[in-house]
Amino acid sequence: MDQKAIVLDNSKSGSKQTKSSGKMQTQTDTNAEVLNTDNSIKKETGSDSEDLFNKFSNKKTNRKIPNIAEELAKNRNYVKGASPSPIIISGSSSTSPSGPSSSSTNPMGIPTNRFNKNTVELYQHSPSPVMTTNKTDTEEKRQNNRNMDNKNTPERGSSSFAAKQLKISSLLTISSNEDSKTLHINDTNGNKNSNAASNNIPSAYAELHTEGNSIESLIKPPSSPRNKSLTPKVILPTQNMDGTIAKDPHLGDNTPGILIAKTSSPVNLDVESTAQSLGKFNKSTNSLKAALTKAPAEKVSLKRSISSVTNSDSNISSSKKPTSEKAKKSSSASAILPKPTTTKTSKKAASNSSDSTRKKNASNKTTSAIKKESNAGSKLNTVKKENSSLSSIKATEKEKDKGGNSTEAKNSTSNVRKEPTAKSPKRLVAAPTVSPPKILQTAETKAKEPSILIDVPLYQADTNDYLDENGQVIFNLSTLIKEKYHPKSKELAQLKDSKRNLLMQLSDHSNGSLEKEKDEEGDVIELDDDEDMEEDEGEIDTETNTVTTTISPKKKSHPMKGKNLIGKYDVEDPFIDDSELLWEEQRAATKDGFFVYFGPLIEKGHYASLERANGTMKRGGVKNK
């Protein structure tokens, strides 16, 4: 018999469905879906099937045997659903979505996710859209197929009944046998007898499509209640190094080797069960937080009880039952709640009674949880694990109760000691009363006289004592205080005034004599102010009384006005240190002299001019011949 492709048609339109037929049909007049090695689909009629077979016979089909388990592990990084392969519903007019596997649906809408030889080649190469070559399709069929695709295509990541009942059957391997040149597509009924032999389908391929793996088995409602609460097992194929399929003794001799993923596998995750367990855990943590807020004083007992809760949770995790976890966490939460103790005699009795009640409550809750689990159909080994975990919980509770008793005793003793101190607090000294400020108080109180009060005129007054030649005010605070508050201040003021008046008169006489000498000789001679001051000081003692009587009240100019003050000190300046003036005068009076000069003191042919005591110049004197 000629080898020809088999058509798998799952459309719900008026066409015949191939699952009702028990034999593989070879249709020469109808169209066939042919998957080329380049992942492109070509439309060919039944009359050209022989040419198609010749093309496939010329191609080299010797390909490397893929390691499907490794490639499925790669796909786990990309797929986020409950299955490592996407849910794909293929019809006569639908296009396959991107993915390595192709699947079909039965009339009940349950995806079979059947992997055949063509899907393995698609798994190795880039995906390409599947096209139909049926020319006799009418517009009604296409419209019905579109409606069916829109209804049956589930969204990626959605948890539905199809996702829960999804079962990945074993993937076919590409054999290196050159006799099987054509691509075989298994029918939905999954017969393995005569058609497999006629179409050169290997026995390994035929064994995969048994009644257990067919669509009819998925259409049946789940008999056991386990399918409703637990997700279906993910079955993964395995291969040996030589390409043969390994067999699992648990599945039988006729079935190929299948690996059943363990419950700890990341593929077999139930979204609803995990959400329920998380909700229960959040409730238990909220109850613990409420207990902590009610009794914040006993922190040590709370920490130990929380550690016991975590230990009990770790022991119970082997059974993986959320009901038992809830019961144990509630019992531990009830153990956390403290009971206040009043006296030392009632502490021990109250602690013993509370411990007994806690143990009874915990034992009752755990036994009730075990009874519920046994009624639900739990096994004997889970009950044994629960009993072992109960013994460990009791041991931890005993240790916790011992530690709690010691901590409660310490806290109660500390409270008893602190009570008398709280009843009789120390009396604080009353704060001094401060009268509120009033407006009338400022007027009633008499202002005290200041210790020092100095008047410094900043403007031109009768006396220009503080004015500089530039009009700036200069004063010395210490001298002002001495002048005003010194016991002999009046006498000192009179002496100062007399000195100043004498200096003013002397300056006037000297200015008049200088003008006369200018007219006579035409020479400008500058007077030494220091010598004048020394001579005047000697004359003040004898003429103090007469000078004061002859002073005129008229304003006079500054005594140093009109003199060349470059390089000279202002004697009247209060800020100038007089000690420096005295030092210069002493240096000039010594024999060594202050200035370094080499040469005759008087030039040849000149006379040294001498100055009299009254300030007049004397002609003649020593002549240097």
Curated annotation (Swiss-Prot):
Major localisation: nucleus
Comp. bias regions, Low complexity: 11-28, 83-105, 305-321, 330-355
Compartments it resides in: Nucleus; Chromosome
UniProt keyword Nucleus, yes or no: yes
Composition-biased stretches (Basic and acidic residues): 136-154
One annotated Gene Ontology cellular component of this protein: HIR complex
Signal sequence interval, chain numbering: none
Biased amino acid composition, Polar residues: 29-39, 113-135, 155-164, 363-381, 404-415
One GO BP: regulation of transcription by RNA polymerase II
Domain of life: Eukaryota
Phenotypic consequence of gene deletion: Abolishes localization of HIR1 and RTT106 to the HTA1-HTB1 promoter.
Segments of this protein annotated with the region Disordered: 1-164, 295-437
Keywords per UniProt: Chromatin regulator, Chromosome, Nucleus, Phosphoprotein, Repressor, Transcription, Transcription regulation
Pfam families named among the record's database cross-references: HUN
Residues where Phosphoserine is found: 47, 49, 435
Quaternary structure (record): Component of the HIR complex, composed of HIR1, HIR2, HIR3 and HPC2. This complex may consist of one copy of HIR1 and HIR3 and two copies of HIR2 and HPC2. The HIR complex interacts with ASF1. Interacts with RTT106.
Similarity remark: Belongs to the HPC2 family.
Function: Component of the HIR complex, which functions as a histone chaperone that cooperates with ASF1 to promote replication-independent chromatin assembly. The HIR complex is also required for the periodic repression of three of the four histone gene loci during cell cycle as well as for autogenous regulation of the HTA1-HTB1 locus by H2A and H2B. DNA-binding by the HIR complex may repress transcription by inhibiting nucleosome remodeling by the SWI/SNF complex. The HIR complex may also be required for transcriptional silencing of centromeric, telomeric and mating-type loci in the absence of CAF-1.
Note: Present with 238 molecules/cell in log phase SD medium.
The name this protein goes by in its record: Histone promoter control protein 2
Record organism: Saccharomyces cerevisiae (strain ATCC 204508 / S288c) (Baker's yeast)
